[in-house]
Amino acid sequence: MTVFLSFAFLAAILTHIGCSNQRRSPENGGRRYNRIQHGQCAYTFILPEHDGNCRESTTDQYNTNALQRDAPHVEQDFSSQKLQHLEHVMENYTQWLQKIENYIVENMKSEMAQIQQNAVQNHTATMLEIGTSLLSQTAEQTRKLTDVETQVLNQTSRLEIQLLENSLSTYKLEKQLLQQTNEILKIHEKNSLLEHKILEMEGKHKEELDTLKEEKENLQGLVTRQTYIIQELKKQLNRATTNNSVLQKQQLELMDTVHNLVNLCTKEGVLLKGGKKEEVKPFRDCADVYQAGFNKSGIYTIYINNMPEPKKVFCNMDLNGGGWTVIQHREDGSLDFQRGWKEYKMGFGNPSGEYWLGNEFIFAITSQRQYTLRTELMDWEGNRAYSQYDRFHIGNEKQNYRLYLKGHSGTAGKQSSLILHGADFSTKDADNDNCMCKCALMLTGGWWFDACGPSNLNGMFYTAGQNHGKLNGIKWHYFKGPSYSLRSTTMMIRPLDF
C-alpha cells in the first residue's frame, strides 16, 4: 500500500513539473515520458498532457489529493521572481523525488530480496525434492545395476570356469589327438615297411613257387621212374625173400643139426688123435658164433648160462670186426615200445626188425664175462654217430636192472648221454627214477631214467618233419639235442676181449 501511494504522489509531481517546464510533444499524442535509471533497472513513467493553459484555478488546485496540498503554493504570474521561486521549488521537488527514489529503492530492495529469497527457497525446495527423487531413483537404479552386475559377474564366473574346463578338455583332446596322430604315423610307416617287405616276399615267394613247380615236375618224373624201379625191386625182393626164406629154413635146419651134434659131442665126447676127447661148447653170444666161422649178419641161436631155453638173437658180423649181439633196434616205428615191466624183462619184437632182447637175458649175458656196449645212431638227415663204453653190465631184477658203465668214447657227443654213475630201469608201471614226475609216463618207453636224463632210445617214434620239439621221442641229447627224435638206433654188446 505504501508503494502504491508513493507511486501516486510521484505521478502528481511529475505531472505538475511537466506542465510547468516541458512542452507538449506532437509525436507523443499529448503524452510525456520520464525515465529513471536505478542500477541495471530503468523505470519509465507516462504522464498525461492537459489541453489549453496549464494554469489551474485555485479551486482545482486545492481539490487535488493530499499529496498535492502538501506541496508549496505557486504564484500564478510569470515574473522572474516566480521563476526563481519555481526553480527553488524545482530543487525541493528534486530532493523530494530523490528521497522517494531512495525510499522506493530501499522498499523494493527488501521486497526483491524477500521475493528472491522466497524464489530461492521455492527453487531450493523443488531442487531438494527433485534431488531426493533423483537420489531415490539413483539408489534404486544403483541397486538394480548392482544386482545385474552381480548376475553378470556370476554368469561371467560360470562362463570363465566353463571356458577353462573347455580349454583343459580341448588341450587334453589336442594332446590325445597329437599322440594318436603320431601313433597313426608310426603305424603308417610300419605298414609301408611291411607292405614293402610283403611285396618283396611275394616276389621271392613267386620265384620260389616257380622253382618249386619246376622241381615238382622234375620230382614227379623222378618219382614215376623210381616207382617203376621200386616195383621191379619189389619183384626182385620178393624173389630174394622167397629164396632167403628157403635159405633161412635150411640154415635153421643146419643149425639144429649142428646143435644136436654139439650136444651129442658134449655128452659122449669126440675122440681126437691120441685117444683124447675135445669138449664142444655151445654159442654163448654172437662172438662165439663169429669165432665158429659164421661171419654173415643174421639171426642165430645162442645158449645163455642159467637160462632154461636158447634165445634167438640178431648178430652183426660186419660192423667194426663183427661179433656184436644186438640187444635193441629201432628203424621204422612198427613196434610199440610203451610197455610194462614184464615185457621189458622178457623182451618183445622180432630180432630181424625192431625188438628189445629183454632185461633178464641182458643180465644173464653180461654176467658171463665182461662186455663192451656200442650204440649206433642215425638222424633224419642221414648223419651217423656212435657212442661206445668199455665196460657194460646190468644188475638183476632185485636191483631194478641197474646200469653200470665205464669208459666212454665215440662221435655222438663229447659227454655220455647214458648215466655213467648208474641208474635203475623204469617202465610205465614201475617208477624207479630219481624224479617225482614219473619219467617213463612222460617220456614213454622203458629206460634207465635218472631224473629223466639226457637219453631215451625207447621213446616215441616220430617220422620226418614231425621229429623236432619232441621231448618224448627217441633222443640222444649230446648228439642232436634234447628234443630231436632220431630215425634209427641199435644197441649191441660184444666181449671186451674179442
Curated annotation (Swiss-Prot):
The keyword Phosphoprotein does not apply. Binds and activates TIE2 receptor by inducing its tyrosine phosphorylation. Implicated in endothelial developmental processes later and distinct from that of VEGF. Appears to play a crucial role in mediating reciprocal interactions between the endothelium and surrounding matrix and mesenchyme. Mediates blood vessel maturation/stability. It may play an important role in the heart early development. Transmembrane segments: none annotated. Glycans are attached at N92, N122, N154, N243, N295. It comes from Sus scrofa. It is found in: Secreted. The lineage of its organism: Eukaryota, Metazoa, Chordata, Craniata, Vertebrata. This is Angiopoietin-1. Disulfide bonds join C286-C315, C439-C452. One of its GO terms (molecular function) is receptor tyrosine kinase binding. Residues 158-254 form a coiled coil. SUPFAM superfamilies: Fibrinogen C-terminal domain-like. GO terms for biological process: angiogenesis; blood coagulation; cell differentiation; Tie signaling pathway. One of its GO terms (cellular component) is extracellular space. Residues 1-19 form the signal peptide. Residues 277-497 form the Fibrinogen C-terminal domain. Homooligomer. Interacts with TEK/TIE2. Interacts with SVEP1/polydom. Interacts with THBD; this interaction significantly inhibits the generation of activated PC and TAFIa/CPB2 by the thrombin/thrombomodulin complex. Keywords: Angiogenesis, Coiled coil, Developmental protein, Differentiation, Disulfide bond, Glycoprotein, Secreted, Signal. InterPro entries: FIB_ANG-like (IPR037579), Fibrinogen-like_C (IPR036056), Fibrinogen_a/b/g_C_1 (IPR014716), Fibrinogen_a/b/g_C_dom (IPR002181), Fibrinogen_CS (IPR020837). It comes from the Eukaryota. PROSITE patterns: FIBRINOGEN_C_1, FIBRINOGEN_C_2.
